[in-house]
């Protein structure tokens, strides 16, 4: 009952960790847009032995909110030394924030995270994030009626008031674009001109993923670490994180989903589209056993998933804000979308894109994609 007091419990041991993992399914049980995540995958996400992103965290504490006999909320507070080193600041993060529709519960959870971080002498708090901006991050601000795409967060509209009520202010917004892969033709005159320009230029080559998957992943992530290096909140992917990401994505990807753009024989751009796993697991209730894995394999490998997501897309910095760079990216992206249509995909999400990244926003809009979800990163400076 809402009249019962809230108790904040630090997570220790496996039993409480299972409760921490179970909170989202309880909170969003009546939300038609919620897609229960695979429990084994979420458990691995928290495990430093299985997730290099979690292993990079120097210090962390998970909290549960309990009202009566029920766990009604959760939050994490943590320190990411890679962020501090890269940005030359002392920052604490909050993340994994989900709670019941009660302002007191949200305030109590956020206060617990802040109190823990204050003992670590951080200058400010950023969030929400799940270990870093390279993983799920941002508070959903717009777009509550549609399901989250794979590796994107979900939430409720009242979270914004809870977070801002605790003194957090907007740091930056991130956008998710939605593309109907069979709409928006003919493309704009600019898009058509850029595509033709790339096709006429003998120094530009567009190629699909090669046979050495791990080598290709290293190529595109090298581009990513360069392309995104000046963006808000950027932390470079480490070698371990790149290998882990490749291992996680390989079982669900399709070969035609990764294309690389080369200039004078050197890789300078790429776009990577994957099936939206959340579509395939929509009714599995987070479990693959005893028969969920059969449904999952059928939907991904045989029946086909109709929705995709582009989580990674990049162009080397030296080509930013140039017609040459725009031509290369336009050709690469249109090639991926064409291959996706041939594979039976009907829609695609491109996410996330920083609100001030006009170049990437322009590329999305050239492909007739429209912004349909907004995620917000918050910050709060602490008094010294």
Predicted segments with their positions:
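Acyl-group handling in specialized metabolite and lipid biosynthesis
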Residues: 10, 144-150, 207-209
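TRNA-binding/sensing appendages of the translation machinery
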Residues: 2-44, 114
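Catalytic cores of nucleotide-enabled group-transfer and carboxylate-activating enzymes in metabolic
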Residues: 14-17, 36-40, 44-48, 56-81, ...
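Acyl-donor binding region in acyl/amide transferases
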Residues: 85-167, 172, 284-366
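An acidic- and aromatic-residue-enriched active-site/binding cleft used to recognize and process polar
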Residues: 68, 78-82, 97-99, 130-132, ...
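A conserved beta-strand-loop-helix scaffold within acyl/acetyltransferase catalytic domains
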Residues: 24-67, 75-85, 211, 215-315
């Amino acid at each position: 009952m809402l009249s019962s007091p809230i108790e904040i419990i630090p997570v220790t041991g496996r039993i409480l960790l299972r409760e921490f993992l179970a909170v989202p399914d309880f909170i969003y049980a009546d939300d038609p847009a919620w897609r229960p995540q695979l429990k084994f995958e979420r458990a691995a996400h928290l495990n430093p032995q299985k997730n290099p992103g979690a292993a990079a965290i120097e210090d962390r504490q998970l909290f549960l909110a309990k009202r009566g006999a029920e766990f009604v909320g959760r939050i994490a507070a943590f320190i990411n030394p890679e962020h501090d080193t890269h940005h030359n600041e002392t920052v604490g993060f909050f993340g994994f924030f989900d709670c019941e529709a009660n302002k007191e519960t949200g305030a109590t959870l956020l206060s617990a995270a802040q109190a823990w971080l204050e003992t670590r002498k951080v200058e400010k708090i950023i969030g929400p994030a799940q270990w870093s901006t390279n993983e799920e991050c941002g508070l959903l601000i717009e777009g509550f009626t549609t399901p989250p795409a794979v590796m994107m967060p979900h939430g409720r509209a009242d979270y914004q008031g809870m977070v801002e009520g605790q003194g957090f202010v907007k740091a930056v917004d991130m956008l998710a674009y939605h593309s109907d892969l069979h709409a928006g033709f003919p493309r704009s005159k600019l898009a058509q001109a850029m595509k033709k320009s790339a096709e006429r230029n003998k120094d530009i080559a567009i190629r699909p993923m090669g046979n050495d998957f791990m080598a290709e992943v290293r190529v595109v992530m090298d581009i990513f670490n360069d392309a995104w290096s000046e963006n808000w909140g950027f932390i470079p992917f480490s070698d371990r994180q790149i290998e882990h990401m490749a291992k996680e994505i390989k079982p669900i990807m399709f070969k035609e989903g990764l294309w690389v753009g080369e200039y004078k024989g050197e890789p300078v751009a790429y776009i990577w589209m994957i099936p939206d796993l959340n579509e395939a697991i929509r009714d599995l209730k987070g479990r693959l056993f005893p028969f969920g894995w059969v449904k999952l394999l059928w939907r991904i490998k045989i029946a086909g998933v109709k929705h995709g997501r582009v989580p990674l897309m990049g162009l080397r910095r030296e080509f930013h804000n140039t017609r040459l760079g725009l031509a290369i990216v336009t050709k690469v992206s249109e090639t991926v979308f064409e291959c996706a249509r041939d594979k039976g995909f009907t829609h695609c999400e491109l996410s996330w894109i920083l609100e001030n990244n006009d170049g990437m926003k322009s590329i999305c809009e050239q492909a007739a994609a429209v912004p349909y979800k907004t995620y917000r990163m918050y910050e709060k400076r602490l008094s010294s």
